[in-house]
Every structure is written in structure tokens, then in C-alpha cells.
UniProtKB/Swiss-Prot annotation:
Residues 609-620 have a biased composition (Polar residues). The gene is MBTD1. A zinc finger (FCS-type) spans 45-80. Residues 574-590 have a biased composition (Basic residues). MBT repeats lie at residues 141-245, 253-350, 351-456, 464-560. It holds the Pfam family MBT. This is MBT domain-containing protein 1. Residues 562-573 have a biased composition (Low complexity). GO terms for cellular component: NuA4 histone acetyltransferase complex; nucleosome; nucleus; site of double-strand break. It comes from Homo sapiens. PANTHER family: MBT DOMAIN-CONTAINING PROTEIN 1, POLYCOMB GROUP PROTEIN. InterPro entries: Mbt, PcG_chromatin_remod_factors, Znf_FCS, Znf_FCS_sf.
Length: 628
């Protein structure tokens, strides 16, 4: 147990030969703080120096781990408490006929019997907590166990720019050293030790205490953004004791020499890491703010809703007319489904007026600048027109990309899209997409990228051919150049694990896997469920999160469905899905499209095969190329 370097000028030549043979620390990224043995960080325990007893609280520990040069106290607090009572202690010692010594307990804040009783109670509490945790881990879901047992990999935090620390994760990687609580210890107080990152999985890190080398027996998972994870040097600055794990406490005779060698030149967290975590979890949206959000029962319109709660940037919105406040809708604050008050009127979008004539007390309109900005577009030249055909993700069945039609052109680049063959007569299931939305595609996108295209319901001329369909319906394809072709260097790869919102039940966040990558489009599979529940999602969707996000924010994570739960829940889930979809979508059939330099609306198209099922790097023109 120790607080900090007393002095690095101390002679460390007494280190054992086993310590001298320790392997060198592997090189690490350059922009993390370097731990220096300059005498300003730590004091290390020296097994040769024997044991000591704190003169304030009576705790026994390694002498060199004690506070101050005289090694009379186990911590700063004991030293300060003793100082205020030193005169009283001195008088008491003289009356007893014994001068105070470094190993003698001079003053107790409470009787020894009471301390022993408290310590026994503390040990019993620890045992009960251990049993409780074991029971929970057996019955609950553990990302660490799930990843270890299956050798999974997780998407890095840098893939999620909207998530906490997504833009300032830096070079946190394997071999970075941190200070963490030492759970392999029988002391009644909370103590710490240094550990290195063995593996990263999102926010979660597999840690190994220094001194265990290749022994993984006490490896443990924790959230790197948690309150108990600190950069090396934090204990010294905070007056917290560092104690080697009990399992290896006799492994080295000179812990100072060992740690100096292991830590010199190694990397640790930035000193302001916890501050950055805290700042990245501050959200501008607050309860009682009013917004316009899509009406989940009539997708073609918006309604006024009030922010009920904010969790990790996700908003629970309650529709303003809901008397019992149970008619709600979940989405992220950067979702394209929410807008400032007055947005619908400004672009010509349908809007359901509220029966409430005036704002309720405490409710106020959300400032417009808090909402996600859309890319500005020029509608003065060639632009989308009503009746043009395209391909679009069905908002009511996100596992499918369907034949679709532009039903209405709104202001500021917004479009109302209808799914061919399954539209409601009143257009209540039209959906608003921006022209730059990554959820709409030019004609032929699915064929080029070998994605199943869902033809219009009731269309019998199969296999579906766009050329024939356009001719039969007297329609034209939306010009390719009007679609968004940007492909960010997102970093996702097939097989990566993450936490994803079930957009058909947006209050649920589930264990999920990336199963396909088509440029910026990701196929998300919910672990334990059939493929029919998969969803197509953009790589920059605010509904995707790193492993450990739910734990970090306190949101409930839905674990993979077991075989029994799938059988029990499948029927009800499908019923919910069909009810929510409003319209029957027809059987899904694999269609092979045959577009081979045919004329679509009198224009020649050459097809460019886009890279798929791999990590995208940089932008690429992957759509059909329209020749001038």
C-alpha cells in the first residue's frame, strides 16, 4: 500500500534479478500522458522494510506504503487527524508511562472491540455482495463473458461520434495503464492498484493487475469511463493508498523497482479524462421542452410532444395531448424525426394541431439551434419531382428496401415518400425523408450491391425489372446525381458487436451485430433473433451505440434472446410488428434484377459495382453513373 513516489532519487539497485528480467513495455500511441519516474508520482512498498501500524487508526500495512517520510500514518486523513490530537495523545502516552513509538497505536477514535466488530461486519458485507453479484452474473447478461466466450470484437467508440467520448476517445488502446480498485485485498478500506488494458470492447476494458504478467486468473472487465478508473498518478494526488493484490504481494521484494520499470514510458489516461467524460454526458435537451415529432400512428404528419426525460442523449417524448402521459415516443436528440416548433409549417409538412390551446406551466419551446442540421440543397435547378421512382428503406419494416415513389416535394430539400403497392388511401403512411438522407437510393442500387429489393405488393411480373416497371407505370427514375454519395470513413466491420435501438420498438436497446456493410449502409442483426428482424441503418445513425453505453448511461440493455424466449415471444412480436406496420407487406422473395444498360426514361446508365461487406474508406461514387 502506498500513496506516491517519495523520491525517485532513492537507490533502486536493490531490485531482484527477477525484476531486472521483466520484459520491456510495448510501444503505445503517442498522445497519451507518459508516466515518468521523476520523483513526483509514487512511493512503492518495499517488502524488506517490514510492516507498520498506523498511529491514528491502528491499521497494519507495508511500512513503505504508509504516508509521510516517517511512515507513521496509513493516509493523509489519519495524519491530519493525528496532528489535531497530538497534544492529547502525547499526554495520554506519558500517563501510561510509554512514549509514543512509530509502531505503537497512540490514539484511537473508538474502542478496539468496536473496530473489530466493524471490520467483521465489513467482511460479511463483502461476502454478501460477492454472492449477490455472482447470482446476478449467472442470471443476467455480461458483455465481458459474451465477448470472451465467443472471441467477438466490438466496434470502437470512435465509430459513434454522437456517443459520449466519441470525438475525443484518442489513443486509448491495449497496454494503457490505469489505477483501479484492488478487489484482491482483505483490508477494510478501499485501496487501489495499477492495471493494464488487455482488450477493449467499446467502453469496456479487460484489465489485468500489474505483476500478473501472463496470468489471466484475476482479469476483470470494467467500463473505462466509470468513476473508479483513473490515470496513473491519481492516487498520489488524492492521497489514496496503492496496495498490490494479495495473490502476488510476496512475488517481488522491491515493488518500487518493479513498478518504476513497468511504468516508465508507458501510457495512461489523460489527466482530464474523467472531466471529458462528464462534459460529454451533458445534454442540451431538458425536461419540459416542446418539440415537433413524427406521429407514430400517422407517419405522414408531426405532433407536438414534450421532453419527459433525457438518458444518454435519448429523449422520452410524451405527446402533448396525452392525459396520462403514457403515449410516448423514444428517439435520440439528433434524430431526424424531431424538429423545432414551427418546422412543419415552414416546409409544408402535415401537422396535427394540438387540442391544448396554451402551453402548460413550465413547458417551453426548444431553441431551434439544438436540433441536428441538414445539408443545404439547391432546388432551383434539376430537382426531384412528384411521381419519380426510387428505392427506399421502408420505415415500417426496416429490414427491407422497397420500390418507392416521391409523393410530394416540400421546402428545404424534404420529400414525402410512399412505398409502392402498400400505401394507405389517405397517404397516412407516407414518410418524410430529406434529399440527402442515406435511407433513399437511386433505381438499381439494390441490384448493384446484391441486396434484396422488395417489389410492390401484388406485382406479379417477377423477377422484378425496373425497366419494365417504369414503362408500365409511365414513370421516370429520379436522377442519380441528386442522391447523397458521401461515404464517411466510419470504421465499422462485419462481425463487430454494438448496442442498437430496435427502431420498431425504439424504447428498446439490444445486443446487436453488424452483418453487412454496403458503403455507409449497415445491416444490423439483433443477437438471438431471426434475420427477419434485422434492420438497415446508416453508419452515422444516432441509434447505434458502443458496447457498454447502456451501463454507462444507466439505460436497460436487452440481452440476446434465448431459444425458449424466442419461441415464446416470436408470435407476439410479429403481431406487434404487423400492427405497427399498418399494411401487409407481402412475402419477401429474393428478386434478381436485370438492368443491363437499358434505357430508363431515355437516358443511358452504366452500373458501377460498389465495394460491399467491408470497411469503407473515404468517399466513393457507388451509385449508378448517369452519362451526360
Amino acid at each position: 500500500m502506498f500513496d506516491g513516489y517519495d523520491s525517485c532519487s532513492e537507490d533502486t539497485s536493490s531490485s531482484s534479478s527477477s525484476e531486472e528480467s521483466e520484459e520491456e513495455v510495448a510501444p503505445l500511441p503517442s498522445n497519451l500522458p507518459i508516466i515518468k519516474n521523476n520523483g513526483q508520482v509514487y512511493t512503492y512498498p518495499d517488502g524488506k522494510s517490514g510492516m507498520a501500524t498506523c498511529e491514528m487508526c491502528g491499521m497494519v500495512g507495508v511500512r513503505d506504503a504508509f504516508y509521510s517520510k516517517t511512515k507513521r500514518f496509513c493516509s493523509v486523513s489519519c495524519s491530519r487527524s493525528y496532528s489535531s490530537n497530538s497534544k492529547k495523545a502525547s499526554i495520554l502516552a506519558r500517563l501510561q508511562g510509554k512514549p509514543p513509538t512509530k509502531k505503537a497505536k497512540v490514539l484511537q477514535k473508538q474502542p478496539l472491540v468496536a473496530k473489530l466488530a466493524a471490520y467483521a461486519q465489513y467482511q460479511a458485507t463483502l461476502q454478501n455482495q460477492a454472492k449477490t453479484k455472482a447470482a446476478v452474473s449467472m442470471e443476467g447478461f455480461s458483455w465481458g463473458n459474451y465477448i470472451n466466450s465467443n472471441s467477438f470484437i466490438a466496434a470502437p467508440v470512435t465509430c459513434f461520434k454522437h456517443a459520449p467520448m466519441g470525438t475525443c476517445w484518442g489513443d486509448i488502446s491495449e497496454n494503457v495503464r490505469v489505477e483501479v480498485p484492488n478487489t484482491d485485498c482483505s483490508l477494510p478500506t478501499k485501496v487501489f492498484w495499477i492495471a493494464g488494458i488487455v482488450k477493449l470492447a467499446g467502453y469496456n476494458a479487460l484489465l489485468r493487475y500489474e505483476g500478473f504478467e501472463n496470468d489471466s486468473g484475476l482479469d476483470f472487465w470494467c467500463n473505462i469511463c466509470g468513476s473508479d478508473i483513473h490515470p496513473v498518478g491519481w492516487c498520489a494526488a488524492s492521497g489514496k493508498p496503492l496496495v498490490p493484490p494479495r495473490t502476488i504481494q510476496h512475488k517481488y521484494t522491491n515493488w518500487k523497482a518493479f513498478l518504476v520499470k513497468r511504468l516508465t514510458g508507458a501510457k495512461t489516461l489523460p489527466p482530464d479524462f474523467s472531466q471529458k467524460v462528464s462534459e460529454s454526458m451533458q445534454y442540451p435537451f431538458k425536461p419540459c421542452m416542446r418539440v415537433e415529432v413524427v406521429d407514430k400512428r400517422h407517419l405522414c404528419r408531426t405532433r407536438v410532444a414534450v421532453v419527459e426525460s433525457v438518458i444518454g442523449g435519448r429523449l422520452r417524448l410524451v405527446y402533448e395531448e396525452s392525459e396520462d402521459r403514457t403515449d410516448d415516443f423514444w428517439c435520440h436528440m439528433h434524430s431526424p424525426l424531431i424538429h423545432h416548433i414551427g418546422w412543419s409549417r415552414s416546409i409544408g409538412h402535415r401537422f396535427k394541431r394540438s387540442d391544448i390551446t396554451k402551453k402548460q406551466d413550465g413547458h417551453f419551446d426548444t431553441p431551434p439551434h439544438l436540433f441536428a442540421k441538414v445539408k443545404e440543397v439547391d432546388q432551383s435547378g434539376e430537382w426531384f419531382k412528384e411521381g419519380m421512382k426510387l428505392e427506399a428503406i421502408d420505415p415500417l419494416n426496416l429490414s427491407t428496401i422497397c420500390v418507392a415513389t416521391i409523393r410530394k416535394v416540400l421546402a428545404d430539400g424534404f420529400l414525402m415518400i410512399g412505398i409502392d403497392g402498400s400505401e394507405a388511401a389517405d397517404g397516412s403512411d407516407w414518410f418524410c425523408y430529406h434529399a440527402t438522407s442515406p435511407s433513399i437510393f437511386p433505381v438499381g442500387f439494390c441490384e448493384i450491391n446484391m441486396i434484396e429489393l422488395t417489389p410492390p405488393r401484388g406485382y406479379t411480373k417477377l423477377p422484378f425489372k425496373w425497366f419494365d416497371y417504369l414503362r408500365e407505370t409511365g414513370s421516370i427514375a429520379a436522377p442519380v446525381k441528386l442522391f447523397n454519395k458521401d461515404v464517411p470513413n466510419h470504421g465499422f466491420r462485419v462481425g463487430m458487436k454494438l448496442e442498437a435501438v430496435d427502431l420498431m420498438e425504439p424504447r428498446l436497446i439490444c445486443v446487436a451485430t453488424v452483418t453487412r456493410i454496403i458503403h455507409r449502409l449497415l445491416r444490423i442483426h439483433f443477437d438471438g433473433w431471426e434475420e427477419e428482424y434485422d434492420q438497415w441503418v446508416d453508419c452515422e445513425s444516432p441509434d447505434l451505440y458502443p458496447v457498454g453505453w447502456c451501463q454507462l448511461t444507466g439505460y436497460q440493455l436487452q440481452p440476446p434472446a434465448s431459444q425458449s424466449s424466442r419461441e415464446n415471444q416470436s408470435a407476439s412480436s410479429k403481431q406487434k410488428k404487423k400492427a405497427k406496420s399498418q399494411q401487409y407487406k407481402g412475402h419477401k422473395k429474393m428478386t434478381t434484377l436485370q438492368l443491363k444498360e437499358e434505357l430508363l426514361d431515355g437516358e443511358d446508365y452504366n452500373f458501377l459495382q460498389g465495394a460491399s461487406d467491408q470497411e469503407s474508406n473515404g468517399s466513393a461514387n457507388f451509385y449508378i453513373k448517369q452519362e451526360p
